[in-house]
Amino acid sequence: MLSGAFKTRLFHPMQKIGFAEALDSIVKSDPRYERDAYIFLRDALDFTTKQQKKVKGTSVRHVSGPELLEGLRQYALKEFGPMVMTVFDSWGIHSSGDIGNMVFNLIGAGIFGKTEKDSLEDFRNVYDFKEVFVKPFAPEKPAMTRARAELPAPKPAASRK
């Protein structure tokens, strides 16, 4: 999906567009997602490639959609903890499909690369946001519910004469 994490696109033979300029253009043409969301996505890609390098022992040249989503999930939980959904909502991100839309916006701008096998479908319904970002912080339900302790009935008050 994302070969050459920070590719640049040639608009003129002598002029390359940088990440900041690409974001300006993307956010202007597709205002669904905030600029900070794209910066976070780039950072999540870096995190993912570093994690894969630790596991595989060599540099990673390509990250698939599901691999990026798993790395993004881990990175988001690390960075934002229980506030992930609040942050993502403020950025316009509500599903794994939104991440795919952002990735393909960056591909279109020449910032991320892709292979012929990569598609938006790689990002559709990969995981449920509430399941992966809210559930880890939800209080655990006890394994067994205890029978509620019954209090003895109150004794009638003695009448005073």
Q: Can you describe what each PLM-predicted range is?
A:
Residues 2, 6, 11-161:
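Non-transmembrane, aqueous-exposed alpha-helical and coiled segments at domain scale
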